[in-house]
């Protein structure tokens, strides 16, 4: 069902908003509701589940923050500080922090108004008490007045649950300060709820009312299915659920079927004023493209920044974290941009640094933020005038989210994407996706900054290495495009790309297989010059030189060992050849020598046998002589001892003779 939404003032809502909420809305400068707010807030206030599809920058955050607060304010009984009434899940820490900041705008105003009302109520009640005491002494009325006087003000507490902090500290904060509204990322929120239930077996979500899944399509794209399902199982089924998304994917619809009951589908579309055609971007956004070869892209970027950075807030999107790091260094170093405010933001930076950069750029009146798609969704950076896409996003869905950082909530904005001539079919592809673009002709006679960039790299090895790493990551990221029929990898000119990056040499990588390109491509610097490039940081350069010297010594040692092995092998071969030659020259002499040697060995063996026989013969004769002497002595002794003894001696002699015979 399609209908036109009345985007009137906030006081036109059927369910009237509280004074504190209206005061905060007025203070923030929102004079009227956006289409998504006009459609969603009444449904939420009427206890309906909602499945919302709306373009980025349409005011989705207020569409769920306001109903959450109003539902708590309209409760008959006040919440305890540890009663969990609502949970808001976001895909990233940065978006969770931003939602928390918006929520605190309302909660802080609510507490200030309650403090003022308490003072006024006390005075009024005291006056009424005096008047009633003068009129009549009614005990029942006095008791009612005392109850009113003791009535507590409404306090709503919130708790931020994101990674990078200690989960035990979150539990302590919850116990001490409460958490009626939880805002967090899926993993940390699920872990927190698990520990709360584990620590208090009696804990139940008795007061729970609303669950919000912000950027639901991205939650599922990032693989948060398990923690989201775990959270859904913990929460009571009697609740209100809101799914907010820029696109309604099949996964989002499946999640809606499992986690919602008869949801109202809200789809807010935008029509172009002149063509009256539906489009996926705000009508206040001037969306453009520029056809520019990769080797000229950096020159066009510098020219663009010179004309816009002083008076505008600009976000430039790159394909990878490494390209953000490299171009952040390069743009700061170019003379014509010296002193200009540059910021960098990507997923590999520490969380504390990302928060600091985000806050600094948000508060700046002008400047340029270089980022990956980390800052493409959900983040509400105020007053962004230009979004420039130096590289096309891998996922075409990210295109709309990138340009959605400008032209938010009815403000004017501008967007520009660089495309090479080989990528021009992307324009028609986006048009089919209801994202129209108009051409912005590239500037002529722009300053060529590439020689200066090469010189910058030549003077600092760190920047040179960052450039090489950036190009490798860019090439591999380009290869993984989800629109490979538009961004065809084999049509990417690696040589011109390296020139456009201002590299001093081509990196070694499997993607570069063109041997002719490797042989012919040059930056104008020789290999010896590149090897001598030093780090500006002395400590780092000292370590590099030590490493180079160590590698050099190892190479020399390895070379010496290889040469020694070659020489030894050569010597052995020469010796073998010499032996063979010697055998050929004196074959007969060698034969005679061998025969003589054999004869000598034979004679030696025969002599040894003869000597052994002679030795045994001499030993035998000596033993026999000794026995004869013993026999003679025995004969003389037997004559003295008598015939018995003689007989025994005869027996002994017989035994000895037998032994001699045996021997």
Swiss-Prot record:
Positions of the Helicase ATP-binding domain: 41-266
Residues engaged in binding ATP: 54-61
EC number: 3.6.4.13
Alphabetic keyword roster: ATP-binding, Coiled coil, Helicase, Hydrolase, Nucleotide-binding, Nucleus, Ribosome biogenesis, RNA-binding, rRNA processing
Residue ranges annotated as motif DEAD box: 214-217
Subcellular location, record wording: Nucleus, Nucleolus
CDD domains to which the protein is assigned, alphabetical: DEADc_DDX55 (cd17960), SF2_C_DEAD (cd18787)
Domain Helicase C-terminal: 297-457
Skewed-composition ranges (Low complexity): 583-594
InterPro entries in UniProt: DEAD/DEAH_box_helicase_dom (IPR011545), Helicase_ATP-bd (IPR014001), Helicase_C-like (IPR001650), P-loop_NTPase (IPR027417), RNA-helicase_DEAD-box_CS (IPR000629), SPB4-like_CTE (IPR025313)
Reaction catalysed by this enzyme: ATP + H2O = ADP + phosphate + H(+)
Residue stretches in coiled coil: 531-658
Pfam families: CTE_SPB4 (PF13959), DEAD (PF00270), Helicase_C (PF00271)
Compositionally skewed regions (Acidic residues) per UniProt: 649-663
Motif (Q motif): 10-38
GO biological process, one term: rRNA processing
Annotated GO CC locations: nucleolus
GO molecular function terms noted in the UniProt entry: ATP binding; ATP hydrolysis activity; RNA binding; RNA helicase activity
Biased composition (Basic and acidic residues): 556-582, 595-619
Functional note: Probable ATP-binding RNA helicase which may be involved in ribosome biogenesis.
UniProt cross-references to PANTHER family, sorted A to Z: RNA HELICASE
Family: Belongs to the DEAD box helicase family. DDX55/SPB4 subfamily.
Recorded domain comment: The Q motif is unique to and characteristic of the DEAD box family of RNA helicases and controls ATP binding and hydrolysis.
Protein name: Probable ATP-dependent RNA helicase ddx55
Species in which this protein is naturally found: Dictyostelium discoideum
Lineage: Eukaryota, Amoebozoa, Evosea, Eumycetozoa, Dictyostelia
